[in-house]
């Protein structure tokens, strides 16, 4: 804020220019070319310098080298695939597991069409859609946590 020139709104000439809609060319700092040729490169180079500095000063621990001849006992997917992995792991019929996975996006597609009143509707006035969303979110979190646990306690999370 200290770099830009603030307009003096008590100046009658400036007020007359502003009333005509021509004040933006006569005060302040123009965005072109000052921001494009000065501020953007400073921000970009500063970001690169910060990332490279962090990479050099605090490199991430890679861990032990991979051994292609020793497979781990249980291979876990990335965290965002945990709910789907838990479905496939606990459902006895694999075809049913695949159908359940296909039912998730199909169900999500149908949620906006349940009791539509207008496109700016309050979610508290759409109890069915809100309930489907909340139950689906809780189920996804429950399955995701269960996927990281052993199979015998994965559905109950060891709580029951």
From Swiss-Prot:
It is found in: Plastid, Chloroplast thylakoid membrane. SUPFAM superfamilies: a domain/subunit of cytochrome bc1 complex (Ubiquinol-cytochrome c reductase) (SSF81648). It is a multi-pass membrane protein. One of its GO terms (cellular component) is chloroplast thylakoid membrane. Component of the cytochrome b6-f complex, which mediates electron transfer between photosystem II (PSII) and photosystem I (PSI), cyclic electron flow around PSI, and state transitions. Belongs to the cytochrome b family. PetD subfamily. This is Cytochrome b6-f complex subunit 4. It comes from Auxenochlorella protothecoides. The gene is petD.
């Amino acid at each position: 804020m200290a770099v830009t020139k603030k307009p003096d709104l008590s100046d009658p000439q400036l007020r007359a220019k502003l009333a005509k809609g021509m004040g933006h060319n006569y005060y302040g700092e123009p965005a072109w070319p000052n921001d494009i040729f000065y501020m953007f490169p400073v921000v970009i180079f500063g970001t690169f310098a910060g990332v490279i500095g962090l990479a050099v000063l605090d490199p991430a621990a890679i861990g032990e080298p991979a051994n292609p001849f020793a497979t781990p006992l249980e291979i876990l997917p990335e965290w965002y695939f945990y709910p789907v992995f838990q479905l496939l792991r606990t459902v006895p019929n694999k075809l049913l597991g695949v159908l359940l996975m296909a039912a998730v996006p199909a169900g999500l597609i149908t949620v906006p069409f349940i009791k539509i009143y207008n496109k700016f509707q309050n979610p508290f006035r759409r109890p069915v859609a809100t309930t489907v969303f909340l139950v689906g979110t809780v189920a996804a979190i429950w399955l995701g946590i269960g996927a990281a646990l052993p199979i015998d306690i994965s559905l109950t999370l060891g709580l029951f």
